[in-house]
Amino acid sequence: MNTRASKRPTALLPAKGWLAALAALVATSLVLAPGTAAARQGTVWLCKPGLEHNPCGPSLATTRLSNDGQTVEGKYTPPKIRRPAIDCFYLYPTVSDDQTDNSDLSIDPEERSIALYQAARYSQRCRVFAPMYRQITLKRLLQGNDTITPKMQRIAYQSALAGWKDYLNNFNHGRPFVLIGHSQGSFLLRKLIAEQIDSNANLRHRLVSAILLGGNVLVKKHRATGGDFKNIPACHSDTQLHCVIAFSTFNEPPPQDAVFGRVNGSLGSPVDPTLKVLCAYPGNSHLKTVLPTAPFAPGTTIGAATNLIGFAQPNATTAWAEFDHAYTGACSSAAGANVLQIAGNPGAPHLRSVPDATWGLHLTDANIALGNLTHIVKREQQAFFQR
């Protein structure tokens, strides 16, 4: 684990400072102009089968809890498939506290934590691959979006693309795969899918689904495709294949200037009346919220922000806590915003928007329905091999 002296987490700034960083978490990966790759360096794998320290391969022992997190309702360990027939390729969101414009490829506590929180649970269904990539850092975002250059954007995308190509050429061996991203990771996967997969019939056939959370995937109004992708539609059932699951989570009506769910020019999105932001969630409306019981890496920006959300503190000794009936949710297009609108059931904590209402529950996107999403991947896998 890296302990470089040059690393000074932005979480040590005053509250307004790191909240300002959060307010720009994903704004940098949207306008990704083509260009030359960053200096070549071999892929550093955050998650890969066989790694000695693999945050995507922990115990899956789980405690089912009451809505307030205090009463144990049961314990179980989901069985892992010994030889998974599919892979999951994951790009993590903006988490790096490196003190540079683009992160390096050293694995730090914040990357380990985010992989555990967002990707590890899929290991019961698939082999999980997650490359480190040179994302635009929180430190750079603190300087303001207008200071982010096309070069920084190219470095982030080309680094992620290099990880994808390494996986595809050296580890995939023709296997079906699921793509998983959140925030900056989703924006990068939008571009990668559009350029590398959408027009490639072979790869499109092997794409089980793409789970692109908190990333404002664009589609044509009144159509299943168009917008970001010409050939890959939205997922409308949990057995549909070669399609996209996408949503951003809110528990209050999204404001007119909401960062997610609207084609309003925020985060660099086009102001185009023929497009809409996709909300496609083919899971059960009774959300299975799943979280690690270990806290997010202390002393990091995202760790500090996560503490503000308000999830129940779990009374559990297992690696995971599951809240089976704390929240319900479904896609909503009320007031022109396409989002996953959730509501708390009795006893469930009211979750807070961080940094403000325009962001909704962005920091919960990957976990609020994680149990449902892993079940969808199971159903999709069954459908893929039963064709």
Task: Mark where each language-model region is.
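Gly/Ala-rich beta-loop-alpha elbow adjacent to hydrolase catalytic centers
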Residues: 181-185, 189
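Surface cap/lid and interfacial helix-loop subdomains adjacent to catalytic sites
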Residues: 159-174, 194-350, 378-379, 383
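Bacterial N-terminal signal peptides
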Residues: 18-31
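N-terminal signal peptide c-region/cleavage motif recognized by signal peptidases
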Residues: 33-36
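N-terminal secretory signal peptides that target proteins for export/translocation
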Residues: 1-15
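Catalytic-loop region of hydrolases
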Residues: 39-84, 104
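Active-site catalytic motif of lipid deacylating hydrolases and related acyltransferases
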Residues: 49-52, 81-84, 90-176, 337-387
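Active-site-proximal beta-strand/loop segments in catalytic clefts of secreted hydrolases
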Residues: 91-94, 132-136, 182-183, 212-216, ...
